[in-house]
Regions:
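C-terminal active-site subregion of NodB/CE4 polysaccharide deacetylases
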Residues: 2-99, 106, 137-146, 153-154, ...
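A broadly conserved amphipathic alpha-helix scaffold signal in soluble, globular proteins
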Residues: 67, 109-116, 195
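Metal-dependent polysaccharide deacetylase catalytic core of the NodB/CE4 family, i.e.
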Residues: 36, 41-42, 93-96, 116-278, ...
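Short, well-structured alpha-helical interface segments that form or flank functional binding sites
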Residues: 64, 106, 110, 214-217
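Conserved beta-strand->loop/alpha-helix structural units within folded catalytic cores of enzymes
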Residues: 101-108, 118-123
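A short acidic, amphipathic alpha-helical/loop segment
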Residues: 110-114, 218, 283-287
Length: 355
């Protein structure tokens, strides 16, 4: 999301909160439930240049959200119960699920104690390569390159581009421009570009992020608690829609099989890496259904409605991220009013509204 879009969304959410529209309309717009999405839960203060801080929330904010959800009358449930709750939405209280992508060690160290304190079930989605200790955290490697460099040169869109990196602001602007260009490239090519930049600046991608994610042994130990569910997140964290059908299926199937083998229990839940429309679509939703998972989640923004019982491999989530660490925004989103307004706009614009 661009800075301008982020600012506009914050303004809209604040308006929903302060006008009282959320409280007034929630009974009609709230829907059946919500699946929250997180990545890092980290108490460290933000750095001057830290573009991936959007993936981080503080433990204090997470705990505030958990309390807000409970106080608002939501039941916090495991993903295993989502279908049943959607099918009986009219007779049930609203529900919330908490999910965390990638299997970062801070999930265990900082998020787990909070969920344990409130007896709140949660799911961690794990790319099997990450748990094996050989994951490619290219977005973090790229951040590390820009932090170390004073300038870089790249061939982008067929022309040579020079980026000055003298200040945090210059580094931040360069990161966002280049990041979205990389996201448009084929997966292998994008990762090769970052690997070449890392080599040119004497950065070892494998060593740069050692210790960031949990090993299989750590995941097994964590999963001994019945509050914890471990789901699959592909092998190598690829944008599946960019892959051929056979490759995409293998990424999904082998990660599901690996989670089952390592934990000794069925793997019933899946998360699409990146999860946006360009990264996961109808083909991937169909593959997930064919592979037998009970739920598969995207990063598409939205709440859950009874109709989602028929789209269990294309479920939206509500992101808890570093740009929106404010309970006003969470309350506004939980009301469902922003999504009702978005759907109204889509209807007038001729687009297909969300369920």
């Amino acid at each position: 999301m661009s800075r301008r879009s982020t600012a506009l969304l914050k303004t809209a959410l604040a308006a929903v909160h302060y006008t009282g529209a959320g409280n007034l309309l929630a009974p009609y717009t709230r829907g059946a439930g919500v699946i929250f999405m997180l990545h890092h839960v980290d108490p460290a203060p933000p750095q001057p240049f830290e573009p991936n801080r959007i993936l981080k929330v503080t433990p204090e904010f997470l705990e505030a959200v958990v309390r807000e959800v409970i106080d608002a009358g939501f039941d916090i449930i495991p993903l295993d119960e989502v279908r049943q709750r959607l099918e009986n939405a009219e007779s049930e209280r609203p529900f919330a699920c908490f999910t965390l992508d990638d299997g970062y060690r801070d999930n265990r160290d900082h998020a787990y104690p909070i969920f344990k304190r409130y007896n709140a079930p949660f799911t961690i989605y794990v790319p099997s390569d990450f748990a094996d200790g050989r994951g490619d955290f290219w977005w973090l490697t790229f951040e590390k390159v820009l932090r170390a460099a004073s300038q870089i040169t790249l061939c982008m869109y067929g022309e040579t581009r020079h980026f000055r990196l003298s200040t945090p602001a210059e580094k931040d602007a360069a990161y966002h421009e280049i990041y979205w260009w990389l996201r448009e490239l084929p997966e292998a090519q994008a990762r090769a570009v970052v690997a070449e930049l890392a080599a040119a600046h004497n950065i070892d991608p494998a060593g740069a992020h050692a210790g960031h994610v949990m090993s299989w042994d750590e995941l097994r130990q964590l999963a001994e608690d019945p509050l914890v569910t471990i789901g699959a997140h592909t092998r190598g964290h690829y944008a599946l829609a960019k892959l051929g059908a056979r490759h995409a299926r293998a990424e999904m199937a082998e990660s599901i099989d690996r989670v089952e083998k390592e934990l000794g229990r069925p793997c019933r839940h899946f998360s699409y890496p990146y999860g946006c429309e360009k990264s996961a679509g109808e083909r991937e939703f169909r593959l997930a259904a064919e592979l037998g998972v009970e739920t598969a989640v995207t990063t598409q923004k939205g709440l859950l409605y009874p109709e989602h019982a028929y789209e269990m491999t294309a479920l939206p989530r509500l992101s808890l991220n570093g740009d929106f660490q404010d309970l006003r925004y969470v309350k506004a989103l939980l009301s469902g009013v922003p999504f009702a307004l978005m759907n109204t706009f889509k209807r007038y614009a001729g687009a297909r509204p969300a369920p």
